[in-house]
Amino acid sequence: MLLTNVAATAASIPSIGPIRVEFILFALTLIGVALFHKKTMYVALIGLAAVLLFKFIFDPGFNLGHHIIGTAHEEGEWRILLNLLGLLFGFAILARIFEESNVPEILPRFLPNDWKGGLVLLFMIMVLSSFLDNIAAAMIGGTIAMVVFKGKVHIGYLAAIVAASNAGGAGSVVGDTTTTLMWIDGVEPVWVLHAFVASIAAFFIFGIFGAIQQHKFQPIISEIPTGVKVDWLKIFIVFFILVGAILTNFLLDFPALGVWIAILIGSLIRKTPWNELSKAWQGTIFLMSLVTIASMMPVEELPPASWQTAFILGFVSAVFDNIPLTKLCLEQGGYDWGVLAYTVGFGGSMIWFGSSAGVALSNMYPQAKNTVSYIKSGWHVAVAYVVGFFVMLWVVGWQPHEPHKKGAEKETPAMHSNP
């Protein structure tokens, strides 16, 4: 029953049954994205406007300035949004510079000349994302795929590229925003390492099926163009950009700053493909709109920390930004951080807008924005998520850590090795 008395107190915000209206507006936005995949930016902006209007009218405690900029006691969303903006634009330029270096042209020499070539490429992407940002790994992988498959990339293989970029970052505190957040919050890097057990198990599912899909759709090219010369200065610029991202991520928790310092310095050496910004802006605004909407959802608490909760959060992260989810889990405490790193990191691969890597890749391959086709052709990613999760639970078990936040509950579920 819709509540009508909304002015009395802040607690009287409208809901339909037990569901707050903000969640319904968010769900309608996601449905709109799925139905109108050629107009995703406009759908996301309409959804953002609707949620903001609702918050302004019905939520007395909402302050947009405090939400974005923050207060003396709590940081706002500005850092996440600014980093996201800088990384999506910056790595679009990086991918183009990498393509212009001609390295993708000579890669067929090092890749097997059958379906295993696509599998090796996915493995390379996964390794890259273990020490690079997953957006960079996805963009580099997508650039290579564009060349070695003559521009004909199966949507199932695109889903596999996104999955590989997220799988590699799951067990590394520098490979994904969620694991970096854990590290900053006090989670030890070794506590997330066993997420690689799940990632490797998942790779054998999405990697093999994705590579076979691609081989049937468009085999890897075997001939290498003659007279191709690698532009080593552009390779240096790519390397410089990646190093800049890693350094400023370590030192300032602001990888986008290092990316853009390196791009500007690199522009003094080689011409920078600034026109890539015009291709990436719609996808960037789309993701920033969804992240902003997600950050305004009234998620005050989660169910008790358990492997079941962590498993479900993986599916939630496919549609709900994993950054606020991770923040909430860190505040709650009591999780096995390796299990959570895998679920909230890899889970976003199941839908193209579930992770920043997927949105970045969709700027290069607009066909990935067809949500129905992505889910249908990328079915192996969801299967891989489930298989990887239970392999990790069987091999490593559920090993929760005591809450490291002051005031959090000190009791955690008993440690056990099987679900």
Regions found by a protein language model. Give the residues of each.
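Helix-loop-helix module between adjacent transmembrane segments
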Residues: 91-96, 124-137, 164-172, 198-210, ...
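Membrane-interfacial loop-to-helix junctions in multi-pass transporters
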Residues: 17-22, 80-84, 110-123, 149-159, ...
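Hydrophobic transmembrane alpha-helices that form the pore/transport pathway of multi-pass ion
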Residues: 117-170, 181-185, 327-342, 367, ...
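Interfacial loop-to-helix junctions that mark the boundaries of transmembrane helices
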Residues: 11-18, 35-37, 64-83, 112, ...
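Juxtamembrane and boundary regions of transmembrane helices in multi-pass small-molecule transporters
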Residues: 100-103, 151-155, 159, 171-172, ...
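Hydrophobic mid-bilayer segments of alpha-helices in multi-pass membrane transport proteins
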Residues: 19-30, 37-63, 81-93, 234-242, ...
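Low-complexity, proline/glycine-enriched hydrophobic segments characteristic of transmembrane helices
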Residues: 1-12, 61-72, 302-303, 378-379, ...
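Transmembrane helical segments that form the transport core of multi-pass membrane transport proteins
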Residues: 238-335, 411-419
